[in-house]
């Protein structure tokens, strides 16, 4: 009931939420079969409710979806991005980019986080620097790029009054 009410309230103010309710086992099974769901689950965090259940999910997900099939998870993440790049153009210098999905967009920052989780058990960029796969300068590029792209994306959403990820020529001129 809480979830239904919260989703309804979000819709009433114009927010679009993806949502579903699954058992722990069903969530793990879905994450093992759909990489898009699995990568969303990498970013899952406790907001409200049973903190113990959230921690049980996190541990089960890490063990059964990622660590238990590390090479496959890694390969599937990369393949999903390749498919998205092909769909949205292969150039990071597109004239009308999708700030979320085009090469060099927000998904590429997320990809670093997903692969970091896969190999090092964390999505935290600073922790990935500490553990070694990222250099401090790479961290700065990722953090600054994420901040810029997120700001642009949020601004476009607010201006459009809906989800808007394509940085059209008009949007480029407005934001310049």
Language model: regions and residue ranges:
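A nucleotide- and high-energy phosphate-metabolite-utilizing enzyme signature
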Residues: 1-176
């Amino acid at each position: 009931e809480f979830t239904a009410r919260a989703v309804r309230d979000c819709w009433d103010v114009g927010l679009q939420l993806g949502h579903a309710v699954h058992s722990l086992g069903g969530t793990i099974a879905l994450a093992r079969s759909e990489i898009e769901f699995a990568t969303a689950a990498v970013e899952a965090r406790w907001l409200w409710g049973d903190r113990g259940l959230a921690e049980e999910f996190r541990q089960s997900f890490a063990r059964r979806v990622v660590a238990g099939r590390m090479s496959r998870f890694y390969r599937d993440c990369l393949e999903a991005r390749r498919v998205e790049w092909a769909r949205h153009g292969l150039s990071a210098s597109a004239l009308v980019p999708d700030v979320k999905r085009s090469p060099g967009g927000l998904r590429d920052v997320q990809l670093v986080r997903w692969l970091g989780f896969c190999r090092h058990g964390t999505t935290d960029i600073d922790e990935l620097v500490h553990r070694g796969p990222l250099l401090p300068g790479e961290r700065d590029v990722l953090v600054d790029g994420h901040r810029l792209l997120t700001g642009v994306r949020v601004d476009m959403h607010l201006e459009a009054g809906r989800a808007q990820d394509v940085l059209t020529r008009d949007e480029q001129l407005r934001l310049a």
